[in-house]
Amino acid sequence: MKIRRLICAALAASLALCPAAFAADTAPKTDRIVTTQNGTGYSVSSVGRHIIPVSDSSQSFDFSPLDGYDLSTLIISDGKYTDRANVVHLDNDLTLNGVTYPIHYQSKTDNGGTSVIRATVDIPAAQDDVTLSAETVST
């Protein structure tokens, strides 16, 4: 639905613009690549292709727990800005370059009866939203 709305809005805007407006220079967009990390007890992944305009030289984006796969602190970074969220109380957000990204939590029990906590951050992007998540065994 979001993509359909964006396409309709883009078509409406293009009909409203005169041909001279199409000749105007637009800022190029840079592919932002979400780094994937794997390790015992947690995984970090991205969902969807995303293009985000960047004003710095960074072309990478990292989302990770602390070393040792400790989910008490999550780290978000685009190479220039970094923020850490203490998630022990399950109520903190991540802020990157003045933008706040809420952290969502889920607790589940896997097939082996182990309790797992998953922290997820949704990042709205120009094309598709990016969902980053990390999970660890609850202690």
Locate predicted features.
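Bacterial N-terminal signal peptides that target proteins for export
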Residues: 1-7
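Bacterial N-terminal signal peptides
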Residues: 10-18
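Sec-dependent signal peptide cleavage junction
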Residues: 17-30
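Small-residue (G/S/T/A) turn/hinge positions that recur once per unit in extracellular repeat modules
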Residues: 39-49, 79
